[in-house]
Amino acid sequence: MTPAVFLVILCFGVASGAPARDPNLDAEWQDWKTKYAKSYSPVEEELKRAVWEENLKMIQLHNKENGLGKNGFTMEMNAFADTTGEEFRKSLSDILIPAAVTNPSAQKQVSIGLPNFKDWRKEGYVTPVRNQGKCGSCWAFAAVGAIEGQMFSKTGNLTPLSVQNLLDCSKSEGNNGCRWGTAHQAFNYVLKNKGLEAEATYPYEGKDGPCRYHSENASANITGFVNLPPNELYLWVAVASIGPVSAAIDASHDSFRFYSGGVYHEPNCSSYVVNHAVLVVGYGFEGNETDGNNYWLIKNSWGEEWGINGFMKIAKDRNNHCGIASQASFPDIF
């Protein structure tokens, strides 16, 4: 197995604001606050309202251009709408990693035996979308999702596993709770610990705590894990044949945080910098196969109200778009 370079990921939740106000938007503002249970001090209200309006204008412009055929995806207001782009990006780390090297001829050759579509949700491998909240626990959600899928493959039972167990107990492997971590370090913890609890016995709190693992409650274990080389070809083969795979991407753009549908392609996305962990649960294409509108199907951890019920279609076979293949891994269970 060729080792890949694996780097710490800083994940992110929700942040704070800036200024402006259009009285015609008062009702929409109140509805948005109610929907996302937002409340502010009088001073903060003015700042948040201004940021919210700026984000609304940006999203409306994007969707108008999308209607004219300029973009391939839509955006919408969501829980991040009172947050500036700068605030959002401050929660991320800028870590350089080697670019993925793609060999088109090899990819075409290997792809002959692979299905055109894969969606592990339809085969029972994927648990419902959860919400990490303000804790930077994306890495733990991505790791847990991959283990859940492999446990289902082995046992036929799909059990939501404990993200909190990883947050509290995998610091010895280099993870740092709500601050940062990687899926492969989480896998290493489970391997050494010889077990991971279920969500039912070790529920998510969204904050760091002392390790409270009880071996008698272990619901999953792994026998090893694989770090994939940073190349979409390897990711393609793994997702087609193994199951859901943990990955990391550049999620620092406004277009990502407000994504709502379509195949996401952000021209400014980096293939060298990753800052948010996700679970790749499938792939496919929109339109005709020859259109080249291929996508990876990823599961996020921002709740079902983000994206396509918590999922995203992100461009596939586009030079490792957003670094999707740069830090991919999956557990072994024999």
Swiss-Prot record:
Disulfide bonds, paired cysteine numbers: 269-322
Propeptide segment residues: 18-113
Residues carrying a glycan: 217, 221, 268, 288
Top-level EC class as recorded in UniProt: hydrolase
Annotated signal peptide: 1-17
Subcellular location: Lysosome
Gene Ontology biological process terms, A to Z: proteolysis involved in protein catabolic process
GO cellular component: extracellular space; lysosome; perinuclear region of cytoplasm
Pfam families to which the protein is assigned, alphabetical: Inhibitor_I29, Peptidase_C1
SUPFAM superfamilies to which the protein is assigned, alphabetical: Cysteine proteinases
Active-site positions on this chain: 138, 276, 300
Keyword Phosphoprotein recorded: no
Protein name, as recorded: Cathepsin J
Gene: Ctsj
